[in-house]
């Protein structure tokens, strides 16, 4: 699990990196577009993933559901922000489906984290 923890931390850093890039692009290159929403998701989920890793380490969240929830947040964020960004930059129809799938994964990730916290409470 140690390598998964490191991978999730690295991916969270990438979410933050791309979130700042998209925020800058939204402000300077494409104001008034949904790039701001993509940036917001990335910039809020990046520290959330890091917080989840800390919560798993301290026992506030269970390991299995905690890591699974964090992974869902990472994948959901990439799909959501990637779908919005690709839709704005290309004429492909596939990206239109990525954002709703990513949003659904984000919702599922937060539900998994809720359950992880509940299960951790019951074990004490």
Question: Where are the predicted features?
Answer:
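Polytopic transmembrane helical bundles with strong interfacial aromatic enrichment
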Residues: 1-124
């Amino acid at each position: 699990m140690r390598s998964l923890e490191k991978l999730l931390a690295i991916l969270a850093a990438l979410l933050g990196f791309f979130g700042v890039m998209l925020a800058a692009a939204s402000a300077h290159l494409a104001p008034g577009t949904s790039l701001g929403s993509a940036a917001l998701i990335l910039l809020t989920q990046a520290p959330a993933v890091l917080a989840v890793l800390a919560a798993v380490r301290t026992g506030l969240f269970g390991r299995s559901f905690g890591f699974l929830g964090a992974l869902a947040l990472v994948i959901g964020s990439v799909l959501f922000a990637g779908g919005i960004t690709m839709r704005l930059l290309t004429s492909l129809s596939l990206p239109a489906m990525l954002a709703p799938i990513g949003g659904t994964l984000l919702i599922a990730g937060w539900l998994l984290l809720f359950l992880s916290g509940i299960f951790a409470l019951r074990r004490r």
